[in-house]
Amino acid sequence: MFLEIILDSATYSFDRVITGKICFETNAATSPRSFQIQLRIKGYAVYHHGFLSSPSHKHPTTASASDSDEATEIFTHSQPLPIPAGPSSKSHAIDFKFKFPSKSASSLPCSKSNDSMVNICYMLKATISKRYAFLGSSQSAKAELIMVPPNLAGKPLSANSSFGSSAKTFQLPEFDSVTPSASLYKQPSFNSNPAPITTSSATHTSQFSTSSSSSVNSVHTPVMVPNPYFQYNSSMTAPSSSSSSVAPFVPRRQFSVSSASDPPQTPISMSPPIPPTPSQFSAFMYQNQQSYLSPQSHYENPLSISSRPSPCCPSTPSSAVTLSNGFDSQSNAYNNSGTGPPMLYKFPQRSYTAPNTSFNSQRRMSSITSLPTASFCPVKHGVSPPSLAGNQPSPLSSPLTNSNVSPSTICSPDNNVTFVNLAPGEKLTFKIEPNDLMDEEEVVENSNMYSIPGKTVATTVCHSSSSSGDFSALSCHRNLSFSESLPTAEDQVHNNHCAVSPSRRSSSNALYLATLPMGYERSNSVSYCSDSSLSSPLPDDNMLQDPHALNMAYAKEFDVLINEVLQSL
C-alpha cells in the first residue's frame, strides 16, 4: 500500500519536516510492533498534453501519438519508520515524520521556469509489512495520511511557478495549496483575507483502499475522501494518466477556511435631525403620517412601511426638533442599500422630495403618472354640505358623508361652467370662505358639525392627466387653514397662482369643506378625485383649541402636496 502526497514545490522548503498519521486495520488484534513501515519519497516531472519526456521538452507531438501525460521519475528516497510499542488492537494509528535528506534538499528541482507544460510533483509512499505474517488475503488494509500542506506558512509564490494544464499559467494568492483531490471538493467562497493557517493543524485527509497480496510493494490507485475541515472549489481537473502507474499530478487549487458569513448590517435606528426649512420639515411629518394612515401602501420595489403613530407637529419648524426613531429600520434600509425610489435615497440629510411616478398605492389613481395638460372643473356653489361626524378618533382619517354631488350635477351645462386650461406644471389654487358658499340655515341642519369662530379657508389644487377634458382623470387635493381672522399673507405662502372668490356670502362660521367635482377618496391625508364621495382631514380637540397650530400643521402638509404635484408634472 502507499500514501500519496503532492508537495507544492514552488513554495515548499525541502528542509521542512513532513508530519502525518498512518491509519490501518487488521483482522486480529496485533501490537503495532508487529509491523514494519517503510516511507519512500519519489519526485516526478509531469509533461502535459503534447510533450514527451525528452530532455529538451520541446518536441510537440500529435494527439494520436501521445494523448496522455508523461511522468519521469527524477528523485527517490526511502527510510524506515520506527513504530513504538503499544497495546494489541485491530485499529492502528501511527504518527510519522519525514524529512528530505539534507544532501539532496538543496538540489531538488522545483519547476521548469521556461515551460508551463512541465510540473514537478513528489509522492510519499508508505509500505506496510508484517514481521511474522502477512495480512490476510481477505483483508483490505486502509491507510490514511493527514498532513499539513507544506505551503501554508505564508511564503509568497515564486514568479516562475507554473502549474496547470493546456499551457495556462495560474497566478494564485498567497495561501493556496495543492489539494489531494481534483474533483471531490467543492469550490470555496474565496475569502479575500483568509487567516494564516498554522502548521500544526491537520488539513488534508487522504484515504486509500488497498487489497493485500504477497507483494507488499504493489502500487494501487488511491481513493480520495473529502476533508471536513475545508471546502474546496475547483473547476480544473487533474491530467489523465493512462500510460503511467504513477498517480496523476493534481494542480494547485484555491481554497479558504470555511467561516460563517458576515453578520448583516444593522440599519441605523435613529434618523438625522429634521431639516430647518418648512418644506423639508413638513415632508418629515408627511412621511410619518403615511406610515400611520396607510400601512397597506407600498413601493413597487417592494417595501412595506410599518404602521405606527406619528408624532405631533410642533407649532413652528425648528432645526433642533428630532424624531426619535422617526423612521423604522425597513425604511432605513433604502438609504443604506441605495435601492428603492430614487427620491428617498438621493439626499443624505433626508430632505424629502415627493415620490415620483414609481410611488404606488392601492388608494391612488393612475392619473398622477402622466400629466400632459390639465383641465379644471369649477366648484358648484349652493349644494348641501356634507355632514362632519364629531366623534372621529383621528384628525386625518374622518371621512365626509352625505355627499350627493355627482360630476354631472356640478359640471352640467345649466350651471354655466367654464373650464380653465392649465399648462404643464402650472398650479391652480383657490380659496373659498364658508360664508360664500351656503346659507346659514343649510348648515344648522347638521348637529354634529364643528363650529369654529373665525374664518375657514379650503384650498384646493387640481390637475388632470387627460388632454381631452375627461373628468374621470381629474385629480385634486385640498388643505384647510384655520385662523381667528381673515387669511393674511402669512397664511398664503404656498405659491398661489390664481385665487377664485365666489360672490355668494352668508353669515355662517361653521367648519365646512368646499364640494369639488368627481368627489374625493382619501389616501394618507391626500384626497384624489375618484368618485362622488368626499373625504377630508378633520381637526381633533387639541388642535381646535389652538387654531394657529392647526393652521401650521395643515400648511406644512399642503406644502408636501404641492411638491408632489410638481414632481408628478
Swiss-Prot record:
Keyword Transcription set for record: no
InterPro entries tied to this protein: Arrestin-like_C (IPR014752)
Gene name of the encoded protein: ste7
A Gene Ontology biological process term: conjugation with cellular fusion
Upregulation: By nitrogen starvation.
Low complexity bias: start-end ranges: 198-219
The organism of origin for this protein: Schizosaccharomyces pombe (strain 972 / ATCC 24843)
Top-rank lineage group of the source organism: Eukaryota
This protein's GO CC annotations: cell division site; cytoplasm; cytosol; mitotic spindle pole body; nucleus
UniProt protein name: Protein ste7
Family: Belongs to the arrestin family.
Keyword Transcription regulation assigned: no
Function: Has a role in promoting meiosis whereby it is involved in establishing the mating pheromone signaling pathway. It also has a role in suppressing meiosis until the conjugation process is complete.
